[in-house]
């Protein structure tokens, strides 16, 4: 992961000390203990994403690092994540405003100027597909993901969680494609649907 981060930061000419300090800061933040990050953390989520980020553009890689900088399963955290990225930009003296605004948009800031970036939708779709790639994991890894995700909603009763989770899964299965990009559709769509159907059967069992 460090090599990915360094490569992205080098693209934007981020000073080496800033690159290193923010890598440490993000890794620590996503590894906090105790926390409710049972899945959305450094050792689980980020490791699953690593291989899929290898060939992504630098802006998308940086967005992936800040996407869950702050995480709360109860309420949205886009504003806090954008604020953390803005702080990084100040430290890095990031001069590429177009890429900065693209990353802000990817992190959920709908007010960020993006008139010049015609590929925003493609970038957003790829970031989302990478986020959902866990759905196509091996049966064993998917079951572990389900267990960790349940722990993140420990504030909910089993009955309420099952109702919520069933609704999410059934909604995903009702749309033509779970993944938006053609590559992910070809490689992961079938496995993701099989895993989700198995989870539905388990929840109903």
What positions do the PLM features span?
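Histidine- and acidic-residue-rich, metal-dependent catalytic cores
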Residues: 81-114
């Amino acid at each position: 992961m460090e090599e990915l981060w360094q490569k992205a930061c080098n693209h934007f000419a981020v000073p080496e000390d800033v690159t290193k300090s923010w890598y440490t800061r993000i890794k620590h933040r996503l590894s906090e203990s105790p926390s409710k990050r049972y899945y959305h953390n450094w050792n689980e989520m980020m490791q699953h994403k690593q291989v899929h980020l290898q060939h992504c553009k630098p802006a998308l890689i940086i967005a992936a690092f800040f996407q869950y900088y702050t995480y709360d399963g109860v309420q949205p955290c886009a504003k806090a994540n954008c604020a953390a990225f803005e702080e990084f930009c100040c430290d890095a003296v990031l001069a590429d405003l177009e890429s900065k605004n693209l990353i802000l948009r990817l992190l959920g800031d709908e007010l960020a100027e993006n008139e010049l970036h015609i590929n925003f939708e493609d970038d957003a779709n790829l970031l989302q597909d990478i986020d959902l790639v866990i759905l196509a994991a091996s049966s064993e890894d998917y079951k572990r993901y389900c267990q960790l995700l349940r722990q993140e909603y420990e504030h909910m009763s089993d009955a309420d969680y099952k109702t919520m989770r069933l609704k999410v899964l059934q909604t995903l299965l009702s749309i033509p494609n779970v993944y938006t990009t053609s590559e992910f559709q070809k490689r992961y769509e079938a496995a993701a649907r099989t895993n989700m159907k198995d989870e539905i059967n388990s929840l109903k069992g």
